[in-house]
């Protein structure tokens, strides 16, 4: 019942803000187009406010999942009209706050102390309010300035309802759309469910923040604020307050004489460092979570907050991704095609030459061009068409990475439109690959694994024995399977034979009856002998042992 109520709530918001205006009717099949034209929202008058504001307000009312979708879109001025993208930027830190007295109560219940004892000063009005939590400024007893992040009450229930509806839609897509299974929508939604539910646990966010801070300790690329663990709970997070210019405020960055080219290049370097050096990356890098330290404009440094969503890669995915990107940067499209096939991302029967030609057609137009001259919308459309043509399957484990890459590319486009993304990224990847296969890299890998190998050495005989034992069981299992298959095959052949006999017997008996029927009724002894012979043959076919 709650799902139905939530569905009605979503439809009501769509109706009230007339979001049907944003539906691409010309791209929908005729039945869906008719459904849209007859839907109840057309009975509502269009509000007398700009369409961008209508979209933003609707996303805010619908909740965090929809807000996060809007945050991703806000960086895509190449995909959205400028008025929509500019309005959606307000989603990043202008979501309406919840009551301050409720925030105080959550803090005191979680940390088991009154706010007056925890802080020398606590600002009851929030300094920022987002879809999942809001942030209050405070000062510790020792004089350090901090921010206090508090989870919105009741937000988990709303998120779980939205996820349930998304799963329902995903199952419908997977079962009834021809491309559904290739896109793995159910698996993608389930992965997203784990991600966003984890974001509701502020202790997990604190752990992610601490890990990122260690990874970039002493770095001039990015600064991560300090977490105060003694004042952290699953619903409350206290961390160092930072000061910087929001990354989206390009005008202010230029006024501060920030080296915009260096800033954009460092954004790319930070992304690839997280993915390939650390295999641990901040996966919610929309403009509301990124600031710039402009104290040294010639050497600007990023500041990242809100580390609730992070991504990781397996060594296998990391290796395949790096090799694919390097081949792509070198325009070695055949290698890209071969890697996609060998990794199972496209079916093994795919013709390499055809796939190589398709990749070249999509990718060649975007090389040696700055971001401002690349239509990312057209690039994505061509990429999706190629994926569909060659049955390329979506890799759910890489969806978070792709979302992050979209954010980074969008930020780079805003900061320094002349940035050549490919030439900036290629040297970093080449250096990373060289380090992996060079003697120091191999020695480091051996050192990392050596303790595990040594620890398992005494167990090696038992491991070998169990492996051979499993092989013996596997042989018996295979033999049993072969026997079962042989039995099924015999049963199938027997069934086919019976069907043939029934059809033949019916035909023979019908022929016998036709020959026996004449103008005069016959006694049994007067039946023609051919008819009798056919009848006997038909009865034999019906009654013979099977």
From Swiss-Prot:
The active site is at residue 284. GO terms for cellular component: plasma membrane. It is found in: Cell inner membrane. Residues 121-501 form the Protein kinase domain. It is an enzyme of class 2 (transferase). Its EC number is 2.7.-.-. GO terms for molecular function: ATP binding; protein kinase activity. Belongs to the ABC1 family. UbiB subfamily. Is probably a protein kinase regulator of UbiI activity which is involved in aerobic coenzyme Q (ubiquinone) biosynthesis. This is Probable protein kinase UbiB. It comes from Hahella chejuensis (strain KCTC 2396). The gene is ubiB.
């Amino acid at each position: 019942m709650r799902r139905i109520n939530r569905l009605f709530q979503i439809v009501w918001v769509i109706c009230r803000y007339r979001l049907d205006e944003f539906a691409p009717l010309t791209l929908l099949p005729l039945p869906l187009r008719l459904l849209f034209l007859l839907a109840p929202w057309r009975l509502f008058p269009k509000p007398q406010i700009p369409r961008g504001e209508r979209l933003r307000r609707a996303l805010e009312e619908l909740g965090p999942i929809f807000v996060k979708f809007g945050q991703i879109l806000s960086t895509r001025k190449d995909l959205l009209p400028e008025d929509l993208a500019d309005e959606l930027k307000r989603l990043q830190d202008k979501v309406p706050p919840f009551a301050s007295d409720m925030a105080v109560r959550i803090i005191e219940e979680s940390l088991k102390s009154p706010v007056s004892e925890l802080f020398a000063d606590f600002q009851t009005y929030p300094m920022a309010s987002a879809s999942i939590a809001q942030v209050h400024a405070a000062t510790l007893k020792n004089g350090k300035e901090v921010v206090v992040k508090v989870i919105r009450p009741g937000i988990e229930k709303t998120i779980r309802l939205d996820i349930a509806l998304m799963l329902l839609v995903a199952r419908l897509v997977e079962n009834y759309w021809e491309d559904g299974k290739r896109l793995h929508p159910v698996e993608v939604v389930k992965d997203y469910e784990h991600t966003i539910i984890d974001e509701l646990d502020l202790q997990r966010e604190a752990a992610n923040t601490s890990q990122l801070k260690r990874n970039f300790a002493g770095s001039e690329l990015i600064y991560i604020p300090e977490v105060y663990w003694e004042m952290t709970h699953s619903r409350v997070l206290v961390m160092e307050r930072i000061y910087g210019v929001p990354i989206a405020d390009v005008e202010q960055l230029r006024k501060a004489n920030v080296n915009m080219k260096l800033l954009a290049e460092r954004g790319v370097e930070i992304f690839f460092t997280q993915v390939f050096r650390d295999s641990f990356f901040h996966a919610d890098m929309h403009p509301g979570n990124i600031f710039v330290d402009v104290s040294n404009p010639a050497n600007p440094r990023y500041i990242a907050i809100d580390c609730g969503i992070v991504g990781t890669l397996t060594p296998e995915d990391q290796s395949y991704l790096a090799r694919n990107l390097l081949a792509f940067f070198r325009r070695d499209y055949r290698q890209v095609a071969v890697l996609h096939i060998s990794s199972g991302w496209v079916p093994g029967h795919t013709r390499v030459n055809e796939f190589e030609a398709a990749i070249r057609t999509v990718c060649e137009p975007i090389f040696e061009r700055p971001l401002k001259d690349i239509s990312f919308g057209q690039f994505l459309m061509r990429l999706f068409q190629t994926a569909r043509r060659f049955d390329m399957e979506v890799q759910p484990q890489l969806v978070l990475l792709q979302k992050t890459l979209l954010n980074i590319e969008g930020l780079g486009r805003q900061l320094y439109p002349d940035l050549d993304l490919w030439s900036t990224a290629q040297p970093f990847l080449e250096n990373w690959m060289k380090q992996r296969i060079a003697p120091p890299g191999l020695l480091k890998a051996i050192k990392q694994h050596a303790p595990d190998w040594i620890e398992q050495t005494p167990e090696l005989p038992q491991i070998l024995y169990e492996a051979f034992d499993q092989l013996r069981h596997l042989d018996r299992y295979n033999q049993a399977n072969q026997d079962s298959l042989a039995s099924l095959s015999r049963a199938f052949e027997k069934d086919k034979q019976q069907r043939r006999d029934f059809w033949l017997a019916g035909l023979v008996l019908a022929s016998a009856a036709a020959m026996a029927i004449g103008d005069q009724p016959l006694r049994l002894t007067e039946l023609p002998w051919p008819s009798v012979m056919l009848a006997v043959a038909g009865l034999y076919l019906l009654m013979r042992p099977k």
